[in-house]
Amino acid sequence: MLKDYKSLELDKILQQLANETTCADAAALAAEIEPDTDLKHVERLLQETDDAFVLMAKFGAPSFYGMTNVTNALRRAQAGGVLNLPELLAVAGTLRAIRSVSDWRKKSESVKTALDYRFETLQPNKFLEE
């Protein structure tokens, strides 16, 4: 199967996708995407991709600027640790990006998509952000 990936230049396609991301973790995930053979799963992902395209065509693309992986800092804070200033700024930036994406989706609420469940998991927290 890897021979097929090579002839399709999958690595180059995934690198182009990774270059379009705004977060290092998203770039790493994009570079590791594997083709799927489950028809139902592929159809669902294609519907999500189509819905994302339609939303961006109608309402513009949301900004993910400031999104960083703050998992380690949040775990340490949850365990009672103290965050330093760069960590606090990273958390604030991520919260700001979440609020921005959530606000963007609210502008397009009238359009139902296969992505709705993903947007519904976003929980902006302006108080904590500031």
Role assignments for model-derived ranges:
Residues 1-130:
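Conserved amphipathic alpha-helical "coupling/scaffold" segments
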